[in-house]
């Protein structure tokens, strides 16, 4: 596996690959089975796979966990090498955001970026969209792979690729879960034993909504109430939102098309997100020719 630490090294690596199909998996490190599932899917579909590890400061708010975010580079390297990753791009902050150019262009998606997580984390999705645009322009992959655990992020990036006619396929991979249903996340490391026991209520609430939907409950407010009730019964008091939205647009669900239930809640020291699409309609990948 090649180590690429700056833009020049990445561009030189990309030039050597010529017209091969390139799969790209952007991450912030602290890798777990969810990330490795993305890599394996890229490995199956593409001739070369590059992973990035970059804890992006512009997607963290002033009172969030940028400095505390777990960084496990040596363990991450070993996992990627064992999985057959071809190249790892692990730049410094200065390599991505040159200090001599403080007024960099920013990418924003006002409609999608200001709702749900964007409403409680102002600027978060602008930071995500900007860094992913830059990474896609540097890597120039055939396909980019994202987990659907962060459903709003996937929707934001899929919309961005469509709107800007970027020549890349955006592929969403289903959430990987622990045996008890908890969605895998790097922030699960923040959970102590009592919080870990509470956290499973997120997936339990989603399953409760799923079964109610299948049995004919198609009222968005009632479905959200079921989920919130499950969280509060587990002792989770700080809930940012429980929302039922259209699975394709993230607009409020009006009873047509597939609904997705989205949760953001604080459990112990961690802010956790999860979601579940209740209908049968799949979430398509996006390809721009």
Curated annotation (Swiss-Prot):
Gene3D superfamilies: HUPs, Pantoate-beta-alanine ligase, C-terminal domain
Localisation per UniProt entry: Cytoplasm
EC identifiers of the protein: 6.3.2.1
Chain sites annotated for binding beta-alanine: 59
CDD domains referenced in this protein's UniProt entry, alphabetically: PanC (cd00560)
InterPro entries: Cyt_trans-like, Pantoate_ligase, Pantoate_ligase_C, Rossmann-like_a/b/a_fold
Active-site residue numbers: 35 (proton donor)
PANTHER family: CYTIDYLATE KINASE/PANTOATE-BETA-ALANINE LIGASE (PTHR21299), PANTOATE--BETA-ALANINE LIGASE (PTHR21299:SF1)
Protein function: Catalyzes the condensation of pantoate with beta-alanine in an ATP-dependent reaction via a pantoyl-adenylate intermediate.
Protein name according to UniProt: Pantothenate synthetase
Organism this protein belongs to: Magnetococcus marinus (strain ATCC BAA-1437 / JCM 17883 / MC-1)
């Amino acid at each position: 596996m090649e180590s690429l630490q700056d833009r020049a090294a990445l561009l030189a690596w990309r030039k050597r690959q010529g017209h091969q199909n390139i799969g790209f998996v952007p991450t912030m490190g602290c890798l777990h089975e969810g990330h490795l599932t993305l890599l394996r899917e890229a490995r199956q579909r593409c001739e070369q796979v590059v992973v990035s590890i970059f804890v992006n400061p512009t997607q963290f708010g002033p009172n969030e966990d940028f400095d505390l975010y777990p960084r496990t580079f040596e363990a991450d390297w070993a996992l990627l090498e064992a999985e057959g990753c071809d190249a790892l791009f692990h730049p410094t902050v200065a390599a991505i955001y040159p200090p001599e150019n403080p007024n960099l262009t920013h990418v924003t998606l006002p409609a999608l970026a200001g709702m749900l997580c964007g409403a409680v984390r102002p600027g978060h999705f602008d930071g995500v969209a900007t860094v992913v645009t830059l990474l896609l322009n540097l890597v120039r992959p055939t396909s980019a792979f994202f987990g659907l655990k962060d459903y709003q992020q996937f929707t934001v990036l899929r919309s961005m690729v469509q709107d800007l006619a970027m020549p890349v396929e955006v592929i969403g991979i289903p959430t990987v879960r622990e045996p008890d249903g908890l969605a895998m996340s790097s922030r699960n490391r923040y959970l102590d034993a009592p919080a870990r026991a509470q956290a499973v209520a997120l997936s339990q609430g989603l399953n409760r909504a799923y079964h109610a939907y299948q049995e004919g409950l198609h009222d968005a407010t009632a479905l959200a109430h079921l989920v919130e009730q499950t969280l509060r019964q587990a002792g989770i008091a700080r809930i940012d939102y429980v929302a039922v939205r259209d699975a394709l647009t993230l607009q409020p669900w009006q009873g047509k098309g597939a609904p997705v239930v989205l949760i953001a809640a604080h459990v112990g020291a961690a802010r956790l997100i999860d979601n579940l699409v209740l209908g049968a309609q799949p979430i398509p990948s996006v390809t721009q020719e």
